[in-house]
Structures are given as C-alpha cells and as structure tokens.
Curated annotation (Swiss-Prot):
Phosphate binds at residues 86, 124-126. Belongs to the RNase PH family. This is Ribonuclease PH. Phosphorolytic 3'-5' exoribonuclease that plays an important role in tRNA 3'-end maturation. Removes nucleotide residues following the 3'-CCA terminus of tRNAs; can also add nucleotides to the ends of RNA molecules by using nucleoside diphosphates as substrates, but this may not be physiologically important. Probably plays a role in initiation of 16S rRNA degradation (leading to ribosome degradation) during starvation.
Length: 239
C-alpha cells in the first residue's frame, strides 16, 4: 500500500495554471499533488556569444527552490555564492528536454530562458518542472507568433513531459511523492516526447540492484503516465 493510498499506476492530481505571471511572455504554475512549480519563459533578442551569427536560437533553463519549499528552511543558493551540483544537473536536464522538441534554426537568433522555481516540494520537482516548462515555452512561442516573429508549429515540433517511477515496498510505482522517494529501493526519472521518443532516463538503485524485468515495468508505467500528461498538456493549451 502506498502512503497516499494511490494505486501503483496512479499519478497525483496534475494541473496547469497558464499565464500565472503577467510579465513573462509565457508562464505556467504546475502542480503535481503537493509539488508546485512556477515555470516562466522569457524572450531575449540575442543568443549566447558562441552562437552568434550561427542562424539559430537557443533554449536555456534555470531551476531553484524557495527557502521554505521544504519541511525546514533552506538557505538561498544566492546567499551561499554558488549553485549546488543538484541544481546544475536539474536545470541542464530541463534545457536538454525542451531543446529536444524545438527547431532551433526556426527560432531565429533569439534565446528563450526558462525559469523553474519550486514553491512547494513533495517529490518529483524536476519532472514537474519539465512538464510545466513545456506549457510556458508553448505560450511564449504563441506570444511571438501573434507578433509575426515565428510560426509556432515550425518551432515547437512535439510535446515533452516527464515523470518519476520507482520501486517502493517491492512494487513498481509511478509519480513518487517525498515519503515514497525517500524510502524507494529504486528511483528513476523518464523524459519522453508526445510521439513516444525517449529524451532521457535517469535510474538509480538505492539498495539492491534492480532487474531488467523491473526496469521494463518502470518503463511501461512511465510510458503510460507521460501519455496522460501529454493529453493534459493538449487540454491545457486548448483552453
């Protein structure tokens, strides 16, 4: 039995609140249960120096957690003077995931900066960030299209979403919350496109190694869960 009472293949309640920020070209407050992340997409009419005059754009991402997003207050990373390895890993993952479904030449020599700020954390912050960031990116590109800057369908080639899966109490389960994640025997994150392409898989055995059969079970859970998330994204942008 999962602590939340959910079935092994049951995700937490997921919601997307678009245009949460009035300033950003695209924004979305995404909720995976009690994990809440504000994702914004900001347009810059420039690219990094190493991309100048290359005829293509760039998507980059930053990730952070508010001090009281967790049970005990954390120091702001800005106050410590450096980002943790975890933060750097997650923001690179978000950027890679979004670039996988973007035609960078079609964007032109522009950069879209994605900011994912965790307001409240209860497990799965990186997967929620990727899934919500896609909505923010979509809405930023839609804003650009309304100003004849790009064609949305030419830049954004597909959906992308992510979900965590793991082995908890000897059972493969989907969308782990903090209690499950902290006690899981195996923890994995899956990033996939709407058409079923794999973008990234991160999997770690916390205790005993997991078998190929167990991995296949996690993969199936993730595939079905991400298909659900993509449908939710479609419904969100249609509204």
């Amino acid at each position: 039995m999962r602590p939340s009472g959910r079935k092994t293949d049951q995700m937490r309640k997921v919601s997307f609140e678009r245009s949460f920020s009035k300033h950003a070209e695209g924004s979305c407050l995404v909720r995976f249960g009690d994990t809440h992340v504000l994702c914004t997409a900001s347009l810059e009419e420039k690219v990094p120096a190493w991309l100048r005059n290359g005829g293509k754009g760039w998507i980059t991402a930053e990730y952070g957690m508010l001090p009281r997003a967790t049970g005990e207050r954390m120091r702001r990373e800005a106050a410590t003077g450096k980002q943790s390895g975890r933060t750097q890993e997650i923001q690179r993952l978000i950027g890679r995931s979004l670039r996988a479904v973007v035609d960078l030449p079609a964007l032109g020599e522009r950069q879209i900066s994605i900011d994912c700020d965790v307001i409240q954390a209860d497990g799965g912050t990186r997967t929620a960030s990727i899934t919500g960031a896609w909505i923010a990116l979509h809405d930023c590109l839609k804003w650009m299209e309304a100003r004849n800057m790009v064609k949305l369908e030419k830049v954004l080639k597909d959906h992308v979403a992510a979900i965590s899966c793991g082995i908890f109490a000897n059972q493969p389960v989907i969308d782990l919350d903090y209690l499950e994640d902290s006690a899981a025997e195996t923890d994995a994150n899956f990033v996939m496109t709407g058409s079923g392409g794999l973008v990234e898989i991160q999997g770690t055995a916390e205790g005993k190694p997991f078998s190929e059969e167990e991995f296949a079970s996690l993969m199936l859970l993730a595939k079905n869960g991400i298909a659900e998330l993509v449908e939710m994204q479609k419904q969100a942008i249609a509204g």
